[in-house]
Amino acid sequence: MRLSIAARRAAEGTREGDSVSVNGVCLTVGERDGQILTFYAMPETLRRTALGGLVEGGAVNLERAMAAGSRFGGHIVQGHVDGVGVVLGMRPEGEAEIWEFGAPEAVLRYAVEKGSVCVDGISLTLVSVTRGSFTVSVLPQTRTNTNLGELGEGDRVNLEADVIGKYVERLLAPRIERFATTERSVEDAV
């Protein structure tokens, strides 16, 4: 699939071969013509993300890769989508809105209240996590300056869990398995 995007700010300083997040999906710039960036999404990318549902003229979230030494805001986002979620609803809360997203277990297993999640490339703080869904608080600034203003119930979004949780799980898995084996051995001996 070929995606050509009028990028304006994201095009500044961007060259062919650079990585750019498109709705939270890390893609490589295949061509650049002024402010138009063209990307090619592989079949595997389309199977694992919501990019196939993009419509011509629709808004997307774009972000260039962070340069080493740059100001760090939000959380570590790689553009490696862990699953596709769906907008379940939104409701006002003061000046903000609470948005609820249905999410697969591949994302929810790393979700903790007050932790971080990436929704369509937007770093957001989790308000609550339940079986099958999570909520985030969306400020007016975020809604206005991202594609959230164009989303509604039932729309699909790309989700990326906080990578720190994935690394912690990977590092601890052998120890947890050894502990479980030891615990079973003790129970069998008793």
Predicted region positions:
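Conserved loop->alpha-helix
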Residues: M1-V190
